[in-house]
Design a protein with these regions (language model features):
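Phosphate/ribose-recognition catalytic cores of enzymes acting on nucleotide-derived substrates
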Residues: 2-132
Length: 132
């Protein structure tokens, strides 16, 4: 996996909104923040840091990087949603590889519109990045 940006982050507890909307995310604390434009990205992520032998399998995922204007949260957030992920694992750290940007951060009129766009983001990512 070369010529792409990778970074690591520590998983922090969020407010649970992604899970409530059907898109459970891992909220990452990343320092320093990657030099990345705010937006939604197709990524691959794995548990922990490969250099420590804690994660061997890359998982297809989406990442939101930036503020969350629909819910009036203006700080920069880094959230990772796995398309398929085994349940029940306790995750403390993720390594993320950025594959490509899907779209800019947008403000939606409500949560229903946000969910519809998230479904579309997943469809576009699968078609353009994860099709096998």
């Amino acid at each position: 996996m070369s010529n792409s940006m990778t970074f690591q982050g520590v998983v922090e507890k969020g407010i649970g909104l992604g899970k409530k909307l059907g898109f459970p995310t891992f909220n990452l604390h990343v320092e320093p923040l990657p030099e990345l434009a705010h937006g939604v990205y197709a990524v691959r992520a794995r548990l922990g840091d490969a250099s420590h032998g804690t994660g061997e399998v890359w998982h297809d995922a989406l990442m939101h990087f930036g503020p969350k204007p629909t819910v009036s949260m203006e700080s920069v957030f880094c959230e990772v949603y796995f398309l398929k992920f085994p349940e029940g694992l306790e995750i403390h750290e993720l390594e993320v590889e950025v594959l490509g940007k899907l779209r800019d951060v947008m403000k939606f009129v409500g949560l229903d519109a946000l969910v519809e766009q998230m479904k579309e983001d997943e469809r576009v990512a699968v078609e353009n990045y994860f099709r096998k």
